[in-house]
Amino acid sequence: MRILLLIISIILAQSKYPADSVLTSPNATIIEKAAVLPIAGWQRLSHNTRLLDCQFYPSCSQYGAIAIKEKGILKGIPMTADRIVRCNPSAFFNHLHMRGGFHDADGRLIDHPTSHLIASKKKSPIVAGILSIFPGAGRVYAGRWFDGFMGFVMVYFTASSAIDASKRDNYFGKSFAYSMAAIFYTGEIYGAYRSAKYYQPQ
C-alpha cells in the first residue's frame, strides 16, 4: 500500500524535479511515463543529498528521462544503462581526453543523449559492438578500459542476481533481475558502439 501511495504522489506532484517534466508531459506515452517513474523517485532522494550529486550534466537520472522521452524505451533504457556505467571515477579523465565541455554553472561534465560530437574513424563501432558479446570487451577495444571493467561488473552482478532469484523461484525477483541484466547487457553493446564512434581522443 505504501508503494502505491508513493507512486500516486510522484505522478500527481508538481514538477519540482527534472524527470517530472516527462511525467506531466501530455506528449509522453503511458509506457514512457512508467519507465520514467523510478527515475522520478530516485531524483527525490538524489537531489536532496550532496553525496549523490552526479558528475555529469544533465545528471544520469535526467539523462535517462530525456533519452526515454526523445528516443523511446527500446533505445532510451540501454542509453541510460550506458550512462550509469560511464559515471565512474574515470569519467573526468575520459572527458578531458576527448576534449568534452563543462557546464558553466557548476563545472559538471556536459554529456547529452543527443550527441553533437563528430564521429571518429579511429576505431570501428561495429567491431566494438560485436566484441561486447563478452561484456566490457567492446569498451576496452574502444580505449575505455575502466568503463569496460565497470560494464562487466554491472552485467555480472545483475546476471548473478537473476540466477540466484531463479534458484529461489521468486517470480517477481527473477523477472526484475533478468530485466536488469538484459538492460545492462544491451547498454554494454550500445555503449561500446558509441565509445568507438564518438568518445575517442581529440
What are these regions (language model features)?
Residues 2-12:
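Sec-dependent N-terminal signal peptides
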Residues 21-202:
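Hydrophobic alpha-helical membrane segments
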